[in-house]
């Protein structure tokens, strides 16, 4: 399947390999800190392991058709404090690395 890339820095919290035709099938969950996690599901193959440090844009998996899925696609989910939120606000393919780092610094400084 098509390559799947992480949308932010984080640590792989879990990887689940499943060919059962239930749920999300094969999936990766990345913990980004500050209460944020992303889930990438219905994958064909996972290229990372639990505990791996991940960088934004890093290749993590191949798109697939596992779990409850009628055709190959990616289920992309953002959660904040375990509540699903609209993912459209959390990715921007055109954002430069410099702008991304600037935003991350603002988030970190607001926590202090």
Where are these regions (language model features)?
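Acidic, glycine-rich catalytic/binding loops that coordinate metals and/or anionic ligands
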Residues: 49-58, 77-112
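Short hydrophobic beta/alpha edge segments that flank linear recognition/processing sites
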Residues: 26-30, 55-67
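Residue-level recognition of beta-strand microenvironments
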Residues: 15-16, 46, 63-66, 90
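Conserved beta-strand positions that form and line the central face of beta-propeller blades
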Residues: 3, 29, 39, 62, ...
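Zn2+-dependent peptidoglycan hydrolase active-site motif and core
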Residues: 6-50, 72-73, 77
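Soluble non-cytosolic domains of exported or imported proteins
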Residues: 1, 68-69
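Extracytoplasmic/periplasmic cell wall- or extracellular glycan-interacting regions that localize
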Residues: 1-7, 101-102
């Amino acid at each position: 399947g098509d390559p799947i890339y992480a949308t932010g820095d984080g640590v792989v919290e879990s990887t689940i390999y499943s060919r059962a035709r239930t749920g999300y099938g094969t999936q990766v969950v990345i913990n980004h800190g500050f209460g944020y996690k992303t889930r990438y599901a219905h994958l064909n193959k996972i290229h990372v392991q639990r505990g791996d440090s991940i960088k934004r844009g890093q290749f993590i998996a191949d798109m697939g058709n596992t779990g409850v899925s009628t055709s190959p696609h990616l289920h992309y989910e953002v959660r904040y404090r375990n509540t699903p939120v609209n993912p459209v606000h959390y990715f921007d393919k055109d954002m430069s690395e410099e702008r991304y780092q600037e935003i991350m610094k603002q988030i970190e400084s607001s926590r202090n």
